[in-house]
Amino acid sequence: MKTSRLACFTLTAALLGAPALAADKVSFKDPTGDDNGPGTYKYPTDPVYKRGSFDLTDFSLAKKGDKLDVSLGFNTTLEDPWKTGSGFSVQMAFIFIDTDGKEGSGSTESLPGLNVKFAPEFAWDKVIVISPQGASRVKAEVGSKAGAVKDNVLVPDRVKGSGRKITATVNAPGLQGEPSQWRYQVLIQSNEGFPAGNDLMTRKVNEYEGQHRFGGGNDGECDPHVVDMLAGAGKGDASEVKAQHEALAFECGEEGVVKKQATLTMVGGEAAPAEKK
């Protein structure tokens, strides 16, 4: 009888543990103090933009069936001064994913308002938009502004900020492969309730900072509107600050015409730091 009960218990434990063991998760780190884009950007002057609000510290993604669980860490405690109900207000993030690693497969253009592109060998297949605004508003903006890539934009079912973390759950049926084989780029921006023109709810970077505008860039559209990002190997070491500044380097001509656009790569892939949960 004792042997039978022990065998039953062991089998039950194994069955309960099986799904967790099958989940595939990747994690990356980012150095602190690099929330200055190409090295020159400054925060808006309004006090709601606390120091560290756009300073990415870590990113993780886990695939569980048809869903993706995402976590983003920041270098300050999140607040919701604009009462969005999401637990945060000023942050916004774009998680670009290259699922097949094939040059020429996917898109090299980013989304409207970011003013960056991707190198051909890092063309993206899917992008997750993390916003404190409701999913219906985000989906409407994507539908009207993302053009030909709108079907490759994933909007989370759930987004929540708590402490220093923003977590989200994304429904992604049919997404092929495992997270440890994918490549990633996380771009940190600021949630804009009244975006200019075709911008996808992103905040402008100007030459001089203002109450609700970043400074240190250009008043045209030749500068990358990215405050922080993953760089290097995504381990969080000091060399990644320089790598970020180089990736976001840009040149503007007269009247804000693009002379050199910021061109990005990704982290992860075959060498991604994966962990089995």
State what each model feature region is.
Residues A23-S27, T99-N115, Q176-K277:
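Acidic/polar low-complexity flexible segments
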Residues M1-F9:
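Bacterial N-terminal signal peptides that target proteins for export
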